[in-house]
């Protein structure tokens, strides 16, 4: 990725529930760029929901599909991409994401993530007796990997989606990806 390349991909990473899809879709709208969610693309291609893929192929099989999808999507230019929470587990994915786009890590604390995901049955890694403890463990394990991959870290805290979008756009402006702040 070259600095000041207006066609660079904008890629969101972070744990499940961090807001990658919601914020990514809003950023894409504001930048008038196509939006892709790697998990949704996998579901569309396979015709199966993520939990079914996990059940039939295991996490390893799903991660293979995810790596293929990331490689394919990041060959495009000028897109906004939301990745799955575990996309950064493989070193080759982290390298590819970092090289083929400007990576924004939406960082949320485990408690906020739990509040956002506790009723979502489409998250196979949280189908445990203690999903909050699982999120805490995932956060501890993955936070360094997200940081390794990211160009920017945005603390999600409690701002509105529009507030987060504005923070992302400000970072993109400073990186030369957008010419000026875009108003909602």
Swiss-Prot record:
UniProt pathway: Metabolic intermediate biosynthesis; chorismate biosynthesis; chorismate from D-erythrose 4-phosphate and phosphoenolpyruvate: step 5/7
Keywords carried by this UniProt record: Amino-acid biosynthesis, Aromatic amino acid biosynthesis, ATP-binding, Cytoplasm, Kinase, Magnesium, Metal-binding, Nucleotide-binding, Transferase
Cofactors, names only: Mg(2+)
Manner of cofactor binding, per the entry note: Binds 1 Mg(2+) ion per subunit.
Keyword Amino-acid biosynthesis: yes
Record-linked Pfam families: SKI
Binding site for substrate: 39, 63, 85, 142
PROSITE patterns named in the record: SHIKIMATE_KINASE (PS01128)
Any single GO BP term: amino acid biosynthetic process
Taxonomy, superkingdom: Bacteria
Catalytic activity, EC: 2.7.1.71
GO cellular component: cytosol
Binding residues for ATP: 17-22, 123
Subcellular compartments: Cytoplasm
Record: residues binding Mg(2+): 21
Substrates-to-products reaction catalysed: shikimate + ATP = 3-phosphoshikimate + ADP + H(+)
Keyword Acyltransferase: no
MF (Gene Ontology): ATP binding; magnesium ion binding; shikimate kinase activity
Annotated function: Catalyzes the specific phosphorylation of the 3-hydroxyl group of shikimic acid using ATP as a cosubstrate.
Subunit-structure text: Monomer.
Family according to the record: Belongs to the shikimate kinase family.
Protein name: Shikimate kinase
Native organism: Burkholderia thailandensis (strain ATCC 700388 / DSM 13276 / CCUG 48851 / CIP 106301 / E264)
